[in-house]
Amino acid sequence: GLICNAAGVFFIYSANRVSNDVRRATFSPRELAELTMNFYRRNYIEGLFLSSAVVGSPDYTCERMIETLRILREEYRFGGYIHAKAIPGADNALITRLGILADRMSVNIELPSNNSLQTLAPDKTKESILRPMGLITNKIKESSAELVRYKHAPRFASGGQSTQLIVGATPASDYLIMSLSAALYKKYELKRVFYSAYIPVVENPLLPAKTTEPPLLREHRLYQADWLLRYYGFDANELLDEKHPFLT
């Protein structure tokens, strides 16, 4: 589910970025909740992934997401799975409320280095991403501890948190990407890092040409390497190094 696709921050690589002349769509919390329930009752879906561009401000956007989930959980008794994407810059109390209503949360890093963030997403900073990620990690730990003491304590994102990295939009190597993933798993105890092959949709000298094929094989190899990190305890340095920075 997407509350709004009108990007409130500037991402050079996004088809929905502020400067792109594309049609914007916005759902009210009630509309999105009703649409979700209609699909759920027909067994078309088993859950909801809720995301939004920033509308007005991070706090206002997060409040609209919370209201959507409140309607689903409290009024419609929606029993499906909910994955909510946290809004960087939103107040901690709002992110906490969102996490209580959702089964899993995510804060998407998108780009694997400070340089690429500054170049392609200048409105996004490392701190704006890692602050809510750290908050979610701490809230999950607090919730787990509370549930040991009180059976009916509210659950916070019981399915954990995840993030996403775009592959191929920048020159970042697989070694850099896997090193970042390993650090995120260790420090923030993420359940998953998802890798998404960059699909060129805009013309910009800072990006691969629109005729460039999406690096789907590279995406596949990163998922294979990620499996070794998560399930077999490998370190990124055991798979790659600066002399051999790519998996393929």
Walk through the language-model features, giving the residues of each.
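Catalytic cores of enzyme domains
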Residues: G160-I166, T170, K191-R192, Y198-P200, ...
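Extended low-complexity acidic/polar segments
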Residues: T96, V107-E110, Y175-L206
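Flexible, glycine/charged-enriched surface loops at secondary-structure junctions
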Residues: A145-K151, Y195, F234-D241
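Long, highly charged, low-complexity intrinsically disordered interaction regions
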Residues: E203-T248
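Conserved Radical SAM active-site core
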Residues: G1-N5, F10-T163, G168-A172, V202-T211
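Long C-terminal interaction/binding lobes of large macromolecular proteins
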Residues: K151, R155-A157, Q164, Y175-K186, ...
